[in-house]
A protein has these predicted regions:
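Structural preference for beta-rich elements and adjacent junctions enriched in aromatics
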Residues: 1-215
């Protein structure tokens, strides 16, 4: 039974370069429950679809068992992904860092303007009796994984931005968000974010680079 954001909530961030797509998640969860599964318990299921969002192309699942073992399940795809999952019991947060090389998604490289259907399902289980396994979920386009593997339920990710360098200026016209279609487009040069003021969402820091957290659920 979900009792509020401290019970289970998640934030998702995307970044990319020509070689890989990177997805980071910060999950707030009062208890961590996973018996060694990539989906049944606290875990993340990734669904990838083509740009038309009518065909599921790849499925990858990730989990951290209660014994501390990393679980990577290549449900559909060649594998080759990388994952780091860490649990902090003091702050009741779990950090997922996922790397998808182009070949793991059947691509030669990632390019500006490329669109990919992506579903991120963050599963939740609890340690109370009868609450283990997949008892709830959050994420971005989670129903792409929960109710069968459904391409049309993914969100459309469009790769934009240039290599770091120059100045970044944002206005209301630069960013558009279509909630119904889950389409996010950001125009501008991805450069130094450190001096920008973020009023509603906190940057997700990875490898010394700041990445705007586009989705916060």
């Amino acid at each position: 039974t979900w009792s509020g954001p401290s019970d289970h909530s998640s934030a998702v961030a995307f970044s990319w370069d020509s070689e890989s797509l990177y997805i980071g998640l910060v999950v707030t969860d009062d208890t961590h429950q996973n018996g060694g599964s990539g989906w049944n318990g606290d875990s993340v299921q990734m669904v990838f679809a083509n740009a038309a969002q009518d065909t599921v192309t790849h499925l990858y699942n990730y989990g951290l068992s209660e014994a501390g073992d990393l679980v990577i399940m290549n449900e559909k795809g060649p594998g080759g992904t990388e994952a780091s999952i860490t649990r902090d019991e003091d702050t009741t947060t779990t950090l997922y860092e996922l790397k998808f090389p182009a070949a793991s998604l059947g691509l030669e490289a990632f390019e500006t303007g490329m669109s990919i259907g992506v579903g991120v399902c963050v599963n939740d289980g609890d340690t109370e009796e009868g609450q283990g396994g997949q008892k709830g979920w959050s994420g971005w386009g989670p129903y792409a994984a929960v109710y069968g593997k459904t391409a049309s339920a993914t969100g459309l990710v469009t790769l934009v931005g240039e290599a770091p360098g120059g100045d970044l200026t944002l206005s209301d016209e630069d960013m558009t968000y279509d909630a119904q279609g889950a389409t996010i487009v950001l125009d501008g040069d991805a450069s130094d974010w450190s001096d920008l003021e973020f009023k509603s969402q906190i940057p997700f820091e990875k490898g010394g680079e700041l990445v705007l957290s586009l989705i916060h659920i």
